[in-house]
Amino acid sequence: MTAESVCLTLVAARRRRDELFDFLSEQRDLVAGFSASDCAGFGPTVRLPSAPEQVKGHADQVLLRIILEKPQADLLLSRIKTAFAGTRLVYWIMPVTEFGILDDRGPEADH
C-alpha cells in the first residue's frame, strides 16, 4: 500500500454482528475484507442488557478489524457513524507498519 495503512477496529454488541457483516459487505468500494472474532466487554461504561451477561459480568461483543488506507478508513468511519448512530459501537484507528499475506508455497519455494 502506498498511502498510510491503518487498522480500523470496531467493537459492538454481538447482536449487531450480522448487521455489521452485511453493512461492511456492501462497502465494496472501501472494504476488501475484514476479520471478526467474538470478545467480552468489561468496564464501567459497558452495558449488560441480558440476564446471562449480568450473571457472567461481561457483555458479549463482536470485534472487527479492517486494514485499509487512512483516507478510506476515514470515509468508512463516516458511513459507520451514520449507519450505526446511537448503537454505542466503539472504534479506534491505529497505524499499520507492515501488512502482507504469506502464500501457500512454503519456504522451500524460494530455493
What are these regions (language model features)?
Residues 1-111:
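Positively charged, small/polar-rich N-terminal and surface patches that mediate targeting and assembly
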